[in-house]
Amino acid sequence: MAPFAPLVSGILLLLWLTAPSRACTCVPPHPQTAFCSSEFVIRAKFVGTSEVNQTTLQRRYEIKMTKMFKGFSALGDAPDTWFVYTPAMESLCGYFHRSENRSEEFLIAGQLLDEKLYITTCSFVAPWNSLSSAQRQGFTKTYAAGCGECSVFPCSSIPCKLQSDTDCLWTDQLLTGSDKGFQSRYLACLPREPGLCTWQSLRPRTA
């Protein structure tokens, strides 16, 4: 049975990674949700070619980390160069990196398993330069303030009703048909007072 252990582990990993996505039918999350639900959030460059392990059915990418926003306790004083793992096939929610620019920085949010970094096509992976200045501020320091107490509640069809005073109604998809609307690009769901969370602007205030 020993020779089959890596294959079994690989299949179990694929099921674990893809179960929430319902066979890759992913609803893009608000960036704050991506931050709070991920075990690591980093800024990094994809510097190596992808390699596929046919035994575990995993693809891995070599990355060079330039900034860590979340995951300090797990990653600690980690080296700058890491491998990020994903299912080998896109049909199994595997992430396929299409950019060939090795100097381009990406925001990568994913999960940790056995001290390895894992992402899927449902993970939040985006060019750093494509994020608004407000989103960059959110990932750098502000989104963390809403984790645990506040929740972004997606509204894609009417009627929508908040479940709690600590929820913020996310209507970008409903109003614009896109997950990259105003609330996604410029707002965070943060505590206003004990037991109450509201949308708050991340844009710098001008005098």
From Swiss-Prot:
Disulfide bonds join 24-93, 26-122, 36-147, 150-197, 155-160, 168-189. Its main location: secreted. It is found in: Secreted. Residues 1-23 form the signal peptide. Zn(2+) binds at residue 24. One of its GO terms (cellular component) is extracellular space. Glycans are attached at residues 53, 101. The activity of TIMP1 is dependent on the presence of disulfide bonds. Residues 24-27, 90-91 are annotated as: Involved in metalloproteinase-binding. Interacts with MMP1, MMP3, MMP10 and MMP13, but has only very low affinity for MMP14. Interacts with CD63; identified in a complex with CD63 and ITGB1. This is Metalloproteinase inhibitor 1. It comes from Equus caballus.
